[in-house]
Design a protein with these regions (language model features):
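PAS-family sensory domains
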Residues: 23-25
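Short, charged amphipathic alpha-helical "coupling" segments at sensory-output junctions
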Residues: 2-21
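Sensory/regulatory domains in signal-transduction proteins
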Residues: 31, 36-132
Length: 132
């Protein structure tokens, strides 16, 4: 799925690109991007995700991702993978099918989990079906 400025959910260098662009560049993309620090405090949240999740940026930025923003991801499939990568210093780049359930009817999505010891932020990318 190609998007603005040759970004795609699947591209291999997306973690490196995320580290080098400003938030305005993320806001034109057609998939969700949530970036958080080692304490899981959300630092980046793009417009696409805000609109489809129904959570405005002020409700998300500066808040703990797994406990306040997305408790439906506070589980072994998602949160634990980030904890393990942080503990071991390993790079995390995994894509998985997932069902989002918080504040909405269940929605099938693809998640891409990105983390690495050399990166300031970890990311959850969310590929959703586009509204009709």
């Amino acid at each position: 799925m190609a998007t603005e400025n040759n970004w795609s959910f699947e591209q291999t260098d997306i973690a490196e690109r995320l580290a080098t662009v400003d938030d305005a560049a993320l806001d034109v993309l057609q998939f969700g991007i949530i970036g958080f620090d080692e304490q899981t405090i959300v630092q980046r949240y793009n417009t696409f995700e805000s609109q489809l999740a129904g959570l405005n940026k002020s409700r998300v930025l500066g808040h703990p991702f797994f406990t306040s923003v997305a408790p439906c991801m506070n589980n072994f499939l998602v949160a634990q993978r980030f904890e393990d990568a942080l503990a071991t210093g390993d790079t995390l780049d995994v894509t998985l099918d997932y069902v989002l359930t918080l504040r909405m009817k269940p929605v099938k999505v693809k998640l891409r989990l990105l983390a690495g010891s050399a990166r300031a932020l970890s990311y959850v990318l969310i590929l959703r079906p586009l509204p009709s």
